[in-house]
Design a protein with these regions (language model features):
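General beta-strand structural signal in soluble alpha/beta enzymes
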Residues: 35-36, 61, 96-98, 123-126, ...
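Short, acidic/turn-prone active-site loops that include or flank metal/cofactor-
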Residues: 13-14, 38-40, 64-65, 127-129, ...
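A contiguous loop/helix-start segment that scaffolds small-molecule binding in enzyme catalytic cores
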Residues: 6, 164-236
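Class I S-adenosyl-L-methionine
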Residues: 1-16, 21-23, 28-119, 203, ...
């Protein structure tokens, strides 16, 4: 019996209209879907494409605690991959949903690493949060020979500072509880006035502003965009 195929589907940043046509079609056709969800409540990736999911679909839910340590999540990925493998061995295709793009800070990569050597895999790219945030602000990220760096806010200040110094365009993501510290860091290096804030990009409760407008209790799905290059078409 031929093995089933695993699809890693990017569901984009939040607005269902930003899901690609291919992703939507594959989700509509899926008999089995898998996705991550927090300890309690639905998964964000699933909520984005809820209208495309059929009523008789089998759902594999991997509930991952939102903690900094890796160990608890890895055992959950192990279990999730084993559940997916049962269907793949039976010749059934499985669609795994991942907000944004599956390979850009995407949880799908951990399942991919566990299954790619044994099963056929296809990945459908999704609109990244960085692209969505830039679009919401009408703000080009980089131009010509500029360099772009994407930084997770949990990094230590020294690491953030050194990477920011080398880049022309900067995106800082995963802000959440780190916002006060990041605000202080950017102020200390003279970039506060050049920093744009986006919360819940592409959604109905989207928040846009400058760093000064960003709440200290920022959503996890929020981002700061900075341009410190010299391209005249980007500088503002």
């Amino acid at each position: 019996m031929a093995k089933g195929k695993l699809y890693g589907i990017g569901t984009g940043p939040g607005d269902p209209e930003l899901v690609t046509r291919k992703a939507w079609r594959l989700i509509q056709q899926a008999g089995i879907i898998a996705y991550l969800a927090p300890d309690d409540g639905p998964g964000f990736a699933r909520s984005i494409v809820a209208e495309a999911i059929g009523h008789e679909v089998c759902e594999i839910i991997m509930r991952v605690p939102m903690r900094t340590g890796r160990a608890p999540a890895q055992s959950i990925y192990d279990d999730g991959a084993k559940q997916i493998a049962v269907y793949l061995d039976a010749g059934r295709d499985v669609v795994m949903l991942c907000e944004g793009d599956p390979l850009f800070y995407g949880s799908f990569m951990y399942v991919l690493a566990r299954l790619r050597d044994e099963y056929p895999v296809e990945i459908v790219a999704g609109v990244t949060s960085v692209s969505a945030c830039a679009a919401s602000h009408l703000h080009p990220l980089v131009a010509r020979n500029d360099s772009l760096v994407v930084l997770p806010a949990p990094l230590p200040d020294d690491a953030l500072r050194s990477r920011i110094e080398l880049a022309d365009g900067i995106a800082i993501m995963k802000l959440g509880r780190h916002m006060p510290r990041i605000r202080s860091l950017l102020t200390s290096i003279g970039l506060a006035d050049k920093t744009l804030y986006v919360g819940h990009a592409s959604l109905g409760n989207e928040l846009l502003g400058l760093l000064a407008d960003a709440p200290d209790e920022a959503p996890y799905f929020s981002m700061l965009l900075i341009y410190k290059g010299d391209d005249p078409w980007i500088m503002r």
